[in-house]
Amino acid sequence: MEIKITEVKENKLIGRKEIYFEIYHPGEPTPSRKDVKGKLVAMLDLNPETTVIQYIRSYFGSYKSKGYAKYYYDKERMLYIEPEYILIRDGIIEKKEGE
């Protein structure tokens, strides 16, 4: 799996970086969010606790996927802005009992 950063935008108003990337995975299935997040965190020297993978989109018959991640400078701001299902999906918070 190879990740290429295509664009990095700094959103100063919200206090985050928005990262667009492409994943090349010839002969392999679409990589998991956990694997992609780990590689992005290592490549860009980010904090995994404040990095969220918004989406990874694969295209039929292609060995390439596109993705979008957000890196927040402050964890409290991330918890306020990001929807709960995204935080649960990325393993940042636990799902509440009874849901």
Swiss-Prot record:
A Pfam family that this protein carries is Ribosomal_S24e
Q: Sorted alphabetically, which keywords does the UniProt record give?
A: Ribonucleoprotein, Ribosomal protein
What does the record give under GO molecular function?
structural constituent of ribosome
Biological-process GO terms, alphabetical: translation
Q: Which InterPro entries match?
A: Nucleotide-bd_a/b_plait_sf, Ribosomal_eS24, Ribosomal_eS24_CS, Ribosomal_uL23/eL15/eS24_sf
Q: Does the keyword Nucleus apply?
A: no
For this UniProt entry, what's an example GO CC term?
ribonucleoprotein complex
Ribonucleoprotein as UniProt keyword = yes
Q: Where is the signal peptide?
A: none
Q: Which family does it belong to?
A: Belongs to the eukaryotic ribosomal protein eS24 family.
Protein name, entry field: Small ribosomal subunit protein eS24
Organism ancestry: Archaea, Methanobacteriati, Methanobacteriota, Thermococci, Thermococcales
